């Protein structure tokens, strides 16, 4: 019972009698020199993995291999961020090397991806039909949350904070279409089409570059066109949140939602 109370109060550590000197020494060392120990271990671990990552970058030939590289580099960026590490420059160099090599990979394969939609990686216009519609078709109530300008490393930072309320059963990456600008990529997600296809099939929903109107004003209408094309008759809700204060207002409405598909666009992250 005493141990449970101590753990519940988030104590740093505890010793159980009878205590020998080595236990006391280990406990003191862990707390007095914790930062130095963690830093040394992190530096050593990254140094050992450096050559493996370089080899991954040099030999990557599939989108799956590049996704694995992104996960690995992001993991190390987050681990080294909290230590005064001599490895920062090495990691920055490795990230730059990966970015340059990935750009060449995309230039080499991008046209082929467009010409072969059945075998290409999942792209912006494929997200809903690949990941969202199947869940709704199975009877799941789905909240599809799109966070603008939200990077993978930012997701990995907030993921542990959400673990109190949510369990991540599966984590997938997809490949954005080019250009990755919101006005193209996000419209492609909701329409399930490339920007050129949107312009040709739904010219009344396409907003040209020289027009002052926001280029993403028709997302809900584009979503409806995709539902119609795939003969999805279920109801849906759509919310676009442009400021953080509005979040509290719409979260109160979520409990009463009966629609199987609920779309939320968070459009203010880059303003924080």
Language-model regions: role of each:
Residues 56-136, 140, 231-272:
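Anion-binding catalytic surfaces of enzymes that hydrolyze or transfer phosphate/sulfate esters
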Residues 19-28:
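C-terminal output helix
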Residues 29-42:
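The C-terminal output helix
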Residues 3-6, 27, 135, 154-159:
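A short acidic (Asp/Glu
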Residues 1-13:
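Alpha4 helix (beta4-alpha4-beta5 surface) of REC/receiver domains from two-component response regulators
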Residues 39-51, 152-259:
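Active-site-proximal alpha/beta segments of enzymes that process anionic O-linked groups
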Residues 139-158, 189, 261-267:
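Beta-strand elements within well-structured catalytic alpha/beta cores of enzymes
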